[in-house]
Amino acid sequence: MKQEYIPLDEFPNKSNEGMLNDEGTSSSGLSTRTRSLELFDNMEESGSFPKVERKIQSLLDELAEVLFQSKQPNDLTRIRKAIAEQLQLWCQACQENADLYRSQQRKLKSRWDSQTDILSQIESTKASLAEVHKAEEISNLKTSITHLDEEIQILQEKLAIVTNQRNTLVKRLQTYDNLEKKKALSMEDRLLTLQEQYDAHANVSSLEKRMEVLKKREDLLRLMVGQALPGMQFFQRLIHQIQAVETKLISILGPTSLSEAALPPLTDVQRTSVLSLLTSTLHSLESARQIADSNTWKPIIVCLELEIVYFENMLTAITSTPVSS
């Protein structure tokens, strides 16, 4: 069951859990750098987009550098927005490829219909040709001629009448023979032409297999886009909430206070307020990470782990800062 998203401000204050250990990893024991390297390992079958994915990876590395090496903290908003924009581009690319696969399927379907129609014509022509060869009229005429020949020998007095009948029937036979021969030749030529047309292109079975592959790719990409869009909305809301927390911290500690080295001495009231805000924020981030884990939003999981470590470090720094008189 997927977890429901809860805004940062609605979480109750809890004591900090999951502080960094001596080796710079979270309490889960998973290095955020290692997890970021695994983001796009399983996307080959759906048609990945290396340029966008490498850009996302680069932004994640840059975010980690800014958060943990105290370099240009003012770039946090830019980096977070850039990550969101790249994820949106990735979704759009998936959508465009899915539409392309659908277009290719339609073209193959048209060719499939054409080949199927040719097959139908071939079968119909074969059936008609078989009927021509089995026509009973030719057999009946030949039988009548044989009977008349026998009657000529027996009934000499009726020779003239029988001869006329025979001549008439012979002419009819010749007429039928000529017509049927022409019809048979025409049908044989038609059959040969249709067979050549069919053999000149991919057969129906091959087209069906290619259509099936394209349909699977389209379905997979559309599924990935459908799964990624909620993650995008979730990540954008999270960015706004983190920025709101930082604004509150700056209002309490001063404009340069987000760097650990620049923390000013705090009064007891300031210290209590900041610790409460950081503890609540960490609890909210942990819950958000569980939601991302349950939905397999890998880039967002890495971002959340970086933010958690960043706020845990700040909490540690605030805890060790002496109280100002």
Swiss-Prot record:
Does the keyword Repressor belong to this entry? no
Coiled coil residues, start to end:
135-223
The entry's keywords: Coiled coil, Cytoplasm, Cytoskeleton
* One GO cellular component term: cytoplasm
The principal localisation class reads cytoplasm
Bias-annotated ranges (Low complexity):
23-32
Q: Where is this region: Disordered?
A: 1-32
Q: Cellular location of this protein?
A: Cytoplasm; Cytoplasm, Cytoskeleton, Microtubule organizing center, Spindle pole body
> Organism's domain of life?
Eukaryota
Protein name per the record:
Uncharacterized protein C1685.04
